[in-house]
Amino acid sequence: VAMLAKDIDIVLLGADRISRSGCVSNKMGSFAAVLCARALAPNAEVVILSESDKIVIDTDLKTHAEEKNDKFEIRRAWGERWERTEKELKLGATQGLVTKNVYFETVEGKHIDRFICETGVLSKEDVKRVSIQRGVKEEEIFGPLKEVS
């Protein structure tokens, strides 16, 4: 990523979730790409291309629990090399390699310049407005159900 980042004009990312504050949850490696671009091509823009329904009412994506995906997905990909590596490093079963299988990471809103969706180009203020509107609508629809439970 770093070798290619110095000559870019734009970093174009998708989004799995967009928070009210403009933070984006996207695939692992997205934040690294943004940081490389900011360091090596400071004039490059970071643009999120996504559907507007990815905008959520949460103000911060950090409130979500850390992913706990199956670590054996990674170990299986390495096959026998995994066991060999553990043996070569002389690690026993109780002190084996720690494996985290994380699919998503957060790119903070301060690193994002604009958002593009089916309704057009959105600023961070536009994202905030959409999120607030969704929160109001959710309360109108589901608020009475909260009182029942």
Q: Each predicted region: which residue ranges?
A:
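Conserved phosphate- and dinucleotide-binding cores of soluble alpha/beta proteins
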Residues: 1-149
